Amino acid sequence: MKKVILVSIIAATSLMAASDKQIEDFYSQMVDSSVKVKVADRHKVAGDIEAVVVKLSKDGNSQDEIVFTKGDFIFPDVIDLKEQKSYLAEVKKEVIAKGISKIYKDEDKANIIVLGSDPKKPTIIMFSDPECPYCRAELAKIETTLKDSNVEIVLTPVHDISSLQKSSLIYKDAKAAKSDSDKVKILRKYYAEDYNVDDKSVSKDDVAKIDNLRKKYFAAGVRSVPFIVNKSDLK
């Protein structure tokens, strides 16, 4: 039998899972009356426990909340001790992958830095930022990553204007790269902590293009970087 921790935020008992209406009513009590609450998806994740995706919408903007239900209980997360995994993290990734897939398949190739092209290897998509320390750590081990996977990088900086400028320069220089090693050198040049951008080297229009690119993926669910997803999960 799996060892599972259920972290409860409300409690009652029932043999059937909480209905969509019960969950929508629960959320409606916690948000402004102008926010539309709708159960967007639900599916079983462990035994009789269901993951429920709740969409909160207002003025054309929306965000997804994830809860778990069994009977009339709902939980913010379910942790499988045997597998050492959080179902919340897993379902979040599924939801984000679904959102990304709708736009990534039509993404301009100029916005994707491709490293590796081995058809026998899986491909990972990495959303990154030249000023993010964890992104720098991923780049530091990129040669090791490429031994097992092809990598497609999209720059979605979460930092200020200098990170947008660096991203623009990376894309500009990457166009002329003749090999993966050239692309990695370009990435490392602009990811270096001591690299300072000359404001005159990047136009406001080019900065705006990167800003629009990142906003598109933020809207799809990318909330932090590095964010890595298997390309095969984009369905």
Spans of features found by a protein language model:
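Positively charged n-region of N-terminal signal peptides that target proteins for export
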Residues: 1-4
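Intrinsically disordered, low-complexity boundary segments flanking structured domains
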Residues: 9, 24-28, 139-141
